[in-house]
């Protein structure tokens, strides 16, 4: 893999989760453009720089030791990549601490560097949280590859920060440079809420939660077919989002024990709040993580999963395949993984490579619900 070579540092970076024969590198031309733009300013070492949505540490590690860096984002995997890449490049793994997007920012900041996320609601929430956190003379610079840069990103910067100047494109990347101006305090539209009839619950959704405006159609197809009569089983909601699968299952299985895990900190925050609202003081483990990577082997009886098919702008079934492998490792012999997936993704054949038996529980014209027994 090529090195990230900028005026600040030369870095050897890896993506997360790691894959054999990884076809993608851990940085892109937008990272290079941002770093070169900052280098041209010859900023003193005491400059306070906030990095938002750094994929795997490309920006924060490059700047470490050159300015005072804080880094925040909504991805557990990105922070895992930050730690591993710090070590890989001769720095202490805790030289930089990733601040989850669910936690407040503490400024003031002289420069803010933003990688524009796939979910613009996350960008909007982050810009709102910058209110009162920018030092006099601050600059906010957002970057993306041109093909992933919607006009709405510039509109959000202008609404919440100030006038925006778009750079020329360099290596198919572009910068949006915002000059802060006095603004009336903005009220965040997040979290959003919606109600379900069956089960009768209200679900809260922070900005980066998948389908935060309403239940996605895959989950809607899955809910009537969740397993019942689980007794005191150990159940995991893998990639839990706002926690709806675990909550619906728990309402039907009062003695079961639940673990909810997602790599999005905002999803985990939403799931924890929704669990408390629906189930009160009933205990559950709700955590951010790399799926079931930290789960003890053969410690679960049931895994529920609506697997994702993208990581930011990267589309593919590699995350789903990894989740299936993790579920197999975590399940007891005889335990079962229940999933919902688009018909065209062919999950049945993939699961058959890992599990003793795979059966179709239900189907709609678009989705299948599958049960895979270890």
UniProtKB/Swiss-Prot annotation:
Pfam assignment, any one: MTS
Compartments where located: Cytoplasm
Keywords: Cytoplasm, Methyltransferase, rRNA processing, S-adenosyl-L-methionine, Transferase
Superkingdom as given in the UniProt entry: Bacteria
Sample GO molecular function, one term: nucleic acid binding
Uppermost EC category: transferase
Predominant cellular place of this UniProt entry's protein: cytoplasm
GO cellular component: a single term: cytoplasm
Record's catalysed reaction(s): guanosine(1835) in 23S rRNA + S-adenosyl-L-methionine = N(2)-methylguanosine(1835) in 23S rRNA + S-adenosyl-L-homocysteine + H(+)
Annotated InterPro entries: DNA_methylase_N6_adenine_CS (IPR002052), rRNA_m2G-MeTrfase_RlmG (IPR017237), RsmC/RlmG (IPR046977), SAM-dependent_MTases_sf (IPR029063), Small_mtfrase_dom (IPR007848)
EC number: 2.1.1.174
Family recorded in the similarity comment: Belongs to the methyltransferase superfamily. RlmG family.
Job description of the protein: Specifically methylates the guanine in position 1835 (m2G1835) of 23S rRNA.
Name of the protein in question: Ribosomal RNA large subunit methyltransferase G
């Amino acid at each position: 893999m090529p090195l990230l070579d900028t005026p600040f540092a030369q870095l050897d970076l890896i993506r997360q989760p790691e894959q054999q024969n990884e076809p993608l590198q851990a940085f892109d031309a937008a990272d290079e453009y941002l770093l070169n733009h900052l280098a041209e300013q010859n900023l003193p070492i005491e400059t306070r720089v906030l990095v938002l949505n750094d994929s795997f540490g490309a920006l924060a590690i490059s700047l470490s030791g050159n300015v005072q860096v804080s880094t925040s984002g909504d991805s557990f995997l990105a922070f895992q990549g930050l730690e591993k890449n710090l070590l890989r490049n001769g720095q202490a793994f805790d030289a930089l601490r990733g601040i989850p997007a669910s936690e407040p920012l503490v400024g003031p900041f002289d420069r803010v560097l933003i990688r524009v996320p796939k979910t613009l609601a996350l960008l909007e929430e982050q810009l709102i949280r910058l209110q009162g956190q920018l030092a006099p003379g601050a600059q906010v610079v957002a970057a993306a590859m041109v093909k992933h840069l919607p006009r709405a990103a510039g509109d959000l910067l202008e609404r919440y920060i100030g006038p925006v100047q778009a750079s020329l494109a360099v290596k198919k990347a572009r910068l949006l440079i915002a000059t802060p101006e006095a603004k009336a305090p903005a009220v965040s539209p997040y979290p959003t809420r919606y109600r379900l009839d069956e089960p009768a619950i209200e679900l809260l959704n922070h900005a980066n939660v998948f389908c935060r405006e309403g239940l996605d159609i895959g989950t809607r197809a899955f809910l009537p077919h969740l397993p019942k009569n689980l007794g005191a089983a150990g159940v995991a909601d893998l990639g839990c989002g706002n926690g709806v699968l675990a909550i619906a299952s728990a309402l039907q299985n009062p003695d079961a024990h639940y673990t909810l895990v997602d790599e999005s900190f905002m999803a985990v925050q939403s799931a924890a709040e929704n669990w408390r609202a629906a189930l009160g003081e009933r205990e559950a483990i709700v955590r951010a993580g790399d799926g079931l990577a930290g789960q003890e082997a053969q410690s679960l009886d049931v895994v529920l999963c609506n697997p994702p098919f993208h990581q930011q702008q990267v589309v593919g079934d590699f995350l789903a395949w990894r989740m299936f492998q993790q579920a197999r490792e975590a399940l007891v012999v005889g335990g079962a993984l229940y999933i919902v997936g688009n018909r065209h993704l062919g999950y049945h054949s993939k699961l058959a490579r890992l599990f003793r038996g795979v059966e179709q529980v239900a189907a709609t014209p678009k989705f299948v619900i599958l049960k895979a027994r270890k």
